[in-house]
Amino acid sequence: MTAPLPLAGNLYENMDKAAAYGYDAVEFHTLPSFHFEWERIKHMRQQKKGDICMLVTGRLYTQLHYCLISDDPENVKGAISGLKAYIDQAQKLGVDIVLGWVKGSVPQGGDRDIYMARLADGLSQLNDYARSRNVRIMIEVINHYETNIFNTAQETLDFISTHALDQCYVHLDTYHMGLEEMDPYEAIHLCGKKLGYFHVADNSRRYPGSGQFDFSRLMQALADVGYDGYVTVECLPEPDRDTAAKKAINYLNACEPKSC
């Protein structure tokens, strides 16, 4: 199975490559133990040869198998500890973190209330820790074929509001929105100022402009709510990584409001 990442491999090479293609920054999928070359990053930023916009925490779940709603208390502790390590890294980089897979999924036949209470407890701890580090947590909204928690913008917003998670924001992705939202553009308006991060791919999950998604309406909706964060391409690397990355940025640049 192919991961939906247009660029992969060495962080610093891809920062440089992305900058050459016209991107402002890259998001970085890594483990919490990754050792950054801080001076190298500082130099690249100064020379405008690449930047990092976000840390993605999925490998804490997919590789280390930690989960915020695990039935094993030690596993939950490991998830929280790992996420705190990501937050520490994000603070040093001056970026935020994405929280997606590590939230887990309620097992079949499980008592949803118990698991959601466990998730609320873990996220409350992380919310407080992130506030102390001036880092925001972007909770990714993922389709129901992949998880059964936070499938829509409304569900995610309600959870954030109910548990007063002031450092947590909604992270939307056009691919998942196309599967879950009755009106993807209205979902953006619904989030408003609580929209913290945004992924784009076309309806087939290939690069923007390759399918049927209306990116002119999308960009206008983002402008309507005053979204000033990153719009990050997360698409399948087809027909190849470099072509997907180039075609995506060229198309999106042409789709600024009133220009598409």
Model-based region annotation:
Residues 40-49, 119-130, 187-190, 217-221:
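Catalytic-core regions built around general acid/base machinery
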Residues 1-4, 29-31, 57-60, 102-104, ...:
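Active-site beta-loop-alpha junctions enriched in small/polar residues
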Residues 1-91, 165, 249-260:
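N-terminal pre-domain/capping segments
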Residues 27, 54, 98-99, 138, ...:
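Conserved beta-strand positions in the central sheet of alpha/beta enzyme cores
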Residues 35, 62-63, 107, 140, ...:
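Generic structural signal for helix capping and beta-alpha/helix-loop junctions
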